[in-house]
Regions:
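Extracytoplasmic/periplasmic substrate-recognition and gating elements
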Residues: 67-68, 106-179
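Extracytoplasmic/periplasmic solute-binding protein
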Residues: 2-47, 87
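Paired acidic/hydrophobic, glycine-rich loop segments that form the ligand-binding mouth/hinge
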Residues: 88-93, 99
Length: 261
């Protein structure tokens, strides 16, 4: 709540710069739906049921500021646009913490020290909130009992309390053990930004509901078509919005694009 208002004020203050880049825009649309009390509906093609009015309602919350240029779809990962000063903020993966430079370098080759701040995901309303759990799991081939036991011992070793915290701090991942979360407050982090990240992770674990994306064969083919198409469309929409066209009508063009994916 208030996120898009801040983005609008930043756009005006900065003379037309986007406030935030989203790595996974459609996932944030989903979390808005869930927080508004609506489950996403999928079709047989592993994509969204676009006849669902709740999907469009949540999409349009993002589409209007997208059409105005207040937010953008990231260039793969938002940290790149943050490190070049293109945007002031990004919404993306916790693992991105390890891909930030110490400086922001602008297109004119001037630079300044980065003061990176990390916060929990923006919320929709005051009810139940949602967050993703994504990434890679461990698996082992069916093998001998001795090797299977060795694999299990290794996993228990890796996920033990403070060792688990050591590992996830280096990787930017989320802890998997209760004792690792309990150790966050007293842990010696490599940077203030890492400390803020894991404070945010701890807060979200307490206040947000974890969600796991359904396993769809074709889903990411749609996503990989959607984001480049949006990035191609939105600069022209931004120019038209700046020229006085109705942003709500321009946002409908992003929905038309969504329907074509």
């Amino acid at each position: 709540e208030g996120f898009f208002e801040v983005a609008a004020k930043y756009y005006e203050w900065s003379g037309g710069k986007s406030f935030c880049a989203f790595d996974y825009l459609i996932q944030n649309v989903e979390y808005d739906m869930l927080a508004s009390g609506h489950e996403p509906v999928y079709n047989d093609a592993d994509w969204y049921d676009t006849s669902d009015p709740n999907l469009k309602a949540s999409w349009m919350k993002f589409a209007v500021p997208l059409a105005k240029g207040h937010i953008v779809v990231s260039d793969k990962y938002a940290n790149t646009q943050i490190m070049t000063g293109e945007v002031a903020a990004g919404v993306g993966s916790s693992a991105a913490i390890n891909y930030y430079n110490d400086t922001v370098t602008y297109p004119d080759n001037t630079s300044e020290k980065m003061n990176l701040k990390v916060l929990p995901l923006p919320k929709t309303g005051s009810g139940e909130q949602f967050m993703p759990v994504t990434g890679t799991g461990f698996s082992a081939y069916k093998t001998t009992e001795a090797k299977a036991e060795a694999a299990a011992i290794f996993l228990r070793w890796l996920t033990e309390g403070e060792r688990n915290l050591d590992f996830v701090v280096e990787s930017g991942y989320m802890p998997v053990h209760d004792s690792a979360f309990e150790a966050i407050d007293g842990y010696e982090f490599p940077s203030p930004a890492h400390k803020e990240l894991f404070s945010a992770v701890k807060t979200m674990r307490k206040e947000y509901t974890l969600t796991i994306r359904p396993e769809f064969t074709n889903y990411y083919n749609y996503v990989e078509a959607l984001y480049p198409a949006l990035k191609k469309l939105c600069p022209a929409l931004q120019e038209r919005a700046d020229s006085g066209e109705d942003a709500a009508l321009l946002a409908e063009e992003t929905w038309d694009l969504f329907l074509e994916i």
